[in-house]
C-alpha cells in the first residue's frame, strides 16, 4: 500500500511539472521578463545600444513569452538592424535599407524589467474600471515595446481582450474567438494613454 501511494505521488509530481512546462511563463511575469533579459544578454545583443526592444507572446490571445526583437545600429554595416531571439534560436538579422534611426538609444541595464509586473497589475485595474471598456474582459498583455524619449524609457503595451457574452463560434473545423486589441502607454504622471491598434 505504501508503494502504491509513493507511485501515485511520483506520478502526480511528474504530471504537475509536465503541465507547468506546457503553460510557459507569462510575458509580463518575473519569469517571462527574466527569459527576455537573458536572451538580450547574449550575442549579438551584448553591449549594444538599442533603439527599440519588443517582447512578444505567441498567437493572438496568448500571453506566454515567446521571443524578443531588438533594433540597434550596427557599426560595421552602418545600418539599423532588427533581430529576433527565442529559446529556439536566433533569426537572421533584418538590415534596414533606410537611413539610420535618429531615435534615442538605451542599454539593457536601463530597461525597468522589475517595474513591469506591478505596472501591468495597475494598468489592468485601470482598464477594468473604465466605463468605455465595461463590455470587455480577459485582458492580457500580448506584446511590450521599450523605447527612449526625452531621456526616459517608455513602454507601450499591446492589450488583447474579448467581449463579454461573445464566446466562441465554430466555422467548419475551426473554433473562432473574436478579440479586440489596443495599445496602452503609461505616462510619467501615473496615468495611461489608451490608443487604437
Region spans (language model):
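C-terminal motif of bacterial Sec signal peptides marking the signal peptidase cleavage site
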Residues: 15-18
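Short glycine-rich, low-complexity/disordered patches
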Residues: 26-31, 38-63, 125-153
Amino acid at each position: 500500500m505504501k508503494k502504491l501511494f509513493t507511485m501515485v505521488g511520483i506520478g502526480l509530481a511528474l504530471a504537475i511539472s509536465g503541465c507547468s512546462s506546457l503553460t510557459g511563463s507569462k510575458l509580463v511575469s518575473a519569469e517571462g521578463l527574466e527569459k527576455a533579459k537573458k536572451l538580450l544578454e547574449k550575442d549579438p545583443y551584448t553591449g549594444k545600444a538599442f533603439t527599440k526592444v519588443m517582447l512578444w507572446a505567441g498567437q493572438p490571445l496568448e500571453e506566454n513569452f515567446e521571443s524578443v526583437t531588438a533594433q540597434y545600429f550596427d557599426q560595421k554595416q552602418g545600418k539599423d538592424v532588427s533581430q529576433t531571439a527565442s529559446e529556439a534560436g536566433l533569426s537572421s538579422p533584418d538590415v534596414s535599407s533606410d537611413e539610420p534611426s535618429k531615435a534615442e538609444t538605451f542599454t539593457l541595464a536601463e530597461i525597468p524589467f522589475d517595474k513591469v509586473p506591478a505596472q501591468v497589475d495597475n494598468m489592468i485595474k485601470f482598464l477594468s474600471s473604465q466605463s468605455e471598456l465595461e463590455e470587455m474582459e480577459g485582458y492580457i498583455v500580448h506584446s511590450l515595446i521599450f523605447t527612449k524619449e526625452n531621456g526616459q524609457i517608455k513602454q507601450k503595451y499591446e492589450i488583447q481582450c474579448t467581449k463579454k457574452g461573445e464566446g466562441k463560434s465554430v466555422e467548419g473545423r475551426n473554433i473562432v474567438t473574436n478579440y479586440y486589441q489596443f495599445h496602452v502607454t503609461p505616462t510619467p504622471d501615473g496615468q495611461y494613454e489608451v490608443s487604437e491598434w
